[in-house]
A protein has these predicted regions:
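Hydrophobic packing within well-folded, soluble alpha/beta domains
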Residues: 50, 119-120, 194
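Hydrophobic aliphatic residues
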Residues: 54-58, 110, 173, 198
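Conserved nucleotide-binding/hydrolysis micro-motifs of P-loop NTPases
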Residues: 24, 69, 81, 88-90, ...
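Switch II of P-loop NTPase G domains
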Residues: 29, 65-74, 87-117, 125-139
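Canonical P-loop GTPase G-domain recognition
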Residues: 14-26, 156-211
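Glycine-rich, phosphate-binding/catalytic loops in enzymes
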Residues: 36, 56-57, 99-102, 136-140, ...
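Conserved C-terminal guanine-recognition region of P-loop GTPase G domains, centered on the G4
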Residues: 107-178
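Conserved G1/Walker A P-loop phosphate-binding module
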Residues: 2-93, 208-210
Length: 211
């Protein structure tokens, strides 16, 4: 739908990505043997569709029209890295007890930040960042956890509108546009940009191991 300005094509190939396990508590978190990239975002932002797009699969991560379905940390093996799908936040129709439980799980996951290579924080490109989005970014900044904001559902806006909204969101969140990627799981738009970012992250992680 849109022209991709990124001329360089990713060399990273996602083969047969597979589900590893789900974790409901900190004790169930896995001990990774490769870089971990986490995916977080507001409920119903399109995390499952984003993961399936990267994996070239339709049903690796279960999608649902009902927000709040991801209540566990779901781990997937993507070959060169492990992807951790985190519980969605900001779902209004969940009890305070359940929200507190999710928050505790997220906090426990991020507390062990040495095991986290990067975080992709997803946000709907059609809407302004929510209070929950801002709080998540502030949390990542405070704990010095590297992240990239990934805008989802890019096919829902025209090329011009997407460009304008991307710039506005970057300003609202005090981010450089380089730290903001736009995607569409429907069309595959932006997928190469995400894979290129992952390549850079993995290369950096391997260099740090070498040092």
């Amino acid at each position: 739908m849109y022209e991709n300005k990124q001329e360089r094509k990713p060399t990273l190939k996602i083969g047969n990505a597979t589900f590893i396990t789900s974790a409901a508590t900190e004790k169930q978190f896995i001990t990774p043997d490769k870089p971990v990239i986490a995916v977080c975002g507001k409920s119903n932002v399109g995390k499952s569709s984003f993961i399936n797009m990267l994996a070239n699969q339709k049903k690796l991560a279960k999608t649902s029209s009902a927000p709040g379905r991801t209540r566990l940390v779901n781990y997937f093996d993507f070959g060169a890295f492990i992807l951790a799908d985190l519980p969605g936040y900001g779902f209004a129709q969940v009890s305070k007890t359940e929200k507190a439980k999710w928050a505790k799980t997220l906090d426990a996951f991020f507390r062990d930040k040495e095991k986290i290579t990067h975080v992709f924080m997803l946000a709907d490109c059609r809407h302004d960042p929510t209070v929950d989005d801002v709080q998540m970014i502030e949390y990542l900044h405070f704990h010095v956890i590297p992240f990239t904001v990934v805008l989802t559902k890019g096919d829902k806006l025209s090329k011009m509108k997407l460009k304008e909204h991307k710039r506005a969101i970057a300003n609202d969140l005090y981010l450089t546009e380089n730290n903001l990627l736009a995607t569409s799981s429907e069309t595959g738009y932006g997928k190469d940009d995400v894979l290129l970012r992952i390549e850079e992250l993995l290369q950096r992680a391997n260099e740090e191991i070498g040092d």
